[in-house]
């Protein structure tokens, strides 16, 4: 009798576990998209949800800007790449759930680096990646990961006139061999559909 009760409780517990969205599942990704009201980000790709901006202001080049703006950002298996773009503000990504994500950073001096946004610290991953303003960058969800939910802060705030999306042959030439992984083919993949003729 005790055996039957234990088995019954175990099966009930298993049913409960199976009914819950798993951390690596597409169901969990869809739940996050709906709950946080994320929408597809044009051109750059991925999912975006605007959280807000700071009430504190700064003046840069004679222009008043909020000290910071905050967003949710998400990559999924359907939209696994945040294509190459340049930002004037500092940009910091914090991994909330999922991942890992490879973060490609291209500095104004011609250096390139790849940092992995993730929770496996022993493997060299980091849960926070901070990118200085004036860099080019792209993010790609690692193979085997179903999604990555991040928060990002931009300082000063994001404005649409302080971003550039995509690049061309001259950019590819400049950053080719700037790191062992920076082949022309890999750089073109990071630019994706936003490759320009310039």
What kind of feature is each model-predicted range?
Residues 1-4:
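Positively charged n-region of N-terminal signal peptides that target proteins for export
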Residues 6-15:
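Bacterial N-terminal signal peptides
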Residues 20-129, 138-139, 145-146, 156-159, ...:
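Non-catalytic, conserved peripheral segments adjacent to functional cores
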């Amino acid at each position: 009798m005790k055996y039957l009760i234990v088995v019954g409780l175990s099966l009930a517990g298993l049913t409960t576990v199976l009914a819950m969205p798993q951390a690596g599942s597409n169901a969990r990704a869809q739940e996050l998209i709906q709950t946080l009201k994320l929408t597809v980000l044009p051109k750059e790709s991925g999912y975006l949800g605007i959280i807000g901006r700071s009430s504190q202001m700064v003046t840069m080049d004679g222009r008043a800007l909020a000290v910071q703006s905050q967003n949710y950002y998400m990559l999924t298996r359907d939209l696994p790449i945040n294509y190459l773009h340049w930002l004037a503000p500092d940009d910091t990504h914090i991994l909330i759930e999922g991942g890992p994500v490879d973060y490609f950073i291209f500095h104004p001096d011609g250096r390139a680096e790849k940092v992995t946004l993730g929770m496996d610290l022993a493997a060299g991953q980091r849960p926070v990646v901070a990118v200085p303003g004036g860099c080019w960058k792209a993010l790609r969800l690692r193979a085997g990961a179903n999604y990555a939910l991040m928060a990002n802060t931009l300082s000063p705030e994001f404005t649409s006139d302080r971003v550039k999306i995509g690049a061309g042959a001259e950019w590819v030439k400049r950053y080719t061999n700037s790191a062992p992984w920076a082949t022309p083919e890999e750089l073109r993949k990071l630019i994706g559909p936003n490759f320009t003729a310039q």
